[in-house]
């Protein structure tokens, strides 16, 4: 049989994301895209609590401020190795807040610098998990590189930035066996889904269909039977909650609402979400 596309071979992860897993997503807007699906499906997921963070230093800044979030699984989505340094203080800022560009110096982090910032974030999450005495298991970290290209760097510059992040991710996987794994969202988008029909109108961001496909590959890599059953149990409740009635005040619809709320309560009780 002839094949008309390359398919990324992704081995099954050596750990599983569980039902109603406690998770933290930090990184580029692709972290929002992926994390939103976990939130919509009732996982205990925190997604970019201090806004989108594009570079490894800013990801560390978020983790430092998230002492009350103790995830069992953390997902870091790396967008760029470019950082902006406030000249007055020498600090890397997470957001320039529309201040004049002359106040900042733009710099590219090296592979080792990217890996160092992320390693500090991993170590901090591990220590927070240990201090909490959590019985949910040891911390697992999933690193992925955002497939979204940065046109403002030029396409060659964008590729150099992504290459730096890919090397940093590989370094972290090798130095943290059993803790850090790499999910190839970047490769899926640029190999399996390389056709422009999988992009939005700006020709840079993945379309909703592309994000959905990457979500399905993510599930196939990290979900076990418990997480899939969790999704299956929640799906009809979610669909019922999103139902738009023609006659919202009717007795029939009020009965439907009451029945749906009872199913939701039973679901939350079953998975200890109350």
Language model features: what each stretch is:
Residues 1-274:
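Extracellular glycan-modifying ectodomains
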């Amino acid at each position: 049989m002839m094949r008309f596309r390359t398919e990324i071979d992704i081995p099954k992860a050596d750990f599983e994301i569980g039902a109603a897993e406690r998770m933290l997503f930090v990184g580029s807007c692709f972290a929002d895209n992926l994390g939103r699906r976990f939130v919509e499906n009732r996982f205990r997921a925190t997604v970019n609590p201090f806004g989108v963070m594009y570079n490894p230093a800013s990801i560390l800044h978020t983790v430092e401020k998230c002492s009350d979030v103790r995830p069992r699984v953390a997902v870091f989505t790396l967008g760029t190795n470019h950082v902006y340094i406030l000249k007055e203080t020498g600090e890397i800022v997470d957001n320039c807040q529309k201040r004049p560009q002359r106040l900042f110096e733009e710099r590219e982090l090296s592979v080792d610098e990217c890996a160092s910032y992320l390693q500090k974030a991993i170590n901090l999450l591990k220590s927070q998990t240990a201090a909490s005495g959590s019985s949910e298991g040891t911390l697992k970290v999933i690193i992925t590189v955002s497939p979204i290209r940065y046109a403002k760097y030029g396409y060659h510059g964008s590729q150099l930035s992504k290459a730096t992040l890919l090397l940093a991710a590989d370094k972290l996987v090798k130095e943290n066996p059993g803790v850090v794994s790499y999910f190839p969202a970047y490769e899926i988008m640029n190999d399996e889904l390389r056709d422009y029909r999988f992009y939005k109108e700006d020709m840079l961001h993945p379309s909703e269909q592309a994000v959905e496909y990457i979500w399905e590959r993510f599930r196939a890599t990290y979900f076990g039977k418990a997480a899939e059953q969790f999704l299956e149990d929640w799906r009809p409740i979610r669909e019922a909650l999103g139902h738009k009635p023609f006659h919202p005040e009717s007795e029939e619809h009020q009965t439907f609402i009451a029945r749906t709320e009872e199913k939701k309560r039973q679901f939350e009780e079953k998975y200890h979400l109350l």
